[in-house]
C-alpha cells in the first residue's frame, strides 16, 4: 500500500468514526466515550501524516508508534460502546476491522 493510499484510508476511518459518533444516542456515556473515540480516531490520520514528514528514521518510528496506539485505543472505545449497549456490534464491525488492518 502506498503512502497516499494509507493517508486516504486513515482519513476515511476518521470520517466514518465521526459519522458513528454523530449517530449515537445522546447520553452522558456516549458523550464521554464518543469524545474519546473522536480524539483517538482522528489522531490516527493526523499522526500518520506527521510520520510521512518525519525528519529521521527514529522520528518516523516514534510517530508510527503513536499511530498504532491511537488505532488500538479507537478499537477499545468502540468495543466499550458495544459492551455498554450504546450501539449494536454490527454498527462498529467494519470500523473495528479497518482499525485492526491499520494496526497490521
Task: Kindly label every feature range from the protein language model.
Residues 1-104:
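Amphipathic alpha-helical assembly/interaction segments
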Amino acid at each position: 500500500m502506498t503512502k497516499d493510499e494509507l493517508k486516504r484510508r486513515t482519513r476515511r476511518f476518521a470520517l466514518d468514526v465521526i459519522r458513528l459518533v454523530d449517530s449515537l444516542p445522546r447520553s452522558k456515556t456516549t458523550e464521554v466515550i464518543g469524545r474519546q473515540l473522536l480524539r483517538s480516531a482522528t489522531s490516527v490520520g493526523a499522526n500518520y501524516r506527521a510520520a510521512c514528514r518525519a525528519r529521521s528514521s527514529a522520528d518516523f518510528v516514534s510517530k508510527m508508534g503513536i499511530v498504532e496506539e491511537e488505532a488500538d485505543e479507537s478499537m477499545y472505545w468502540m468495543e466499550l460502546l458495544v459492551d455498554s449497549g450504546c450501539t449494536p456490534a454490527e454498527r462498529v464491525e467494519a470500523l473495528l476491522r479497518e482499525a485492526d488492518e491499520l494496526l497490521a
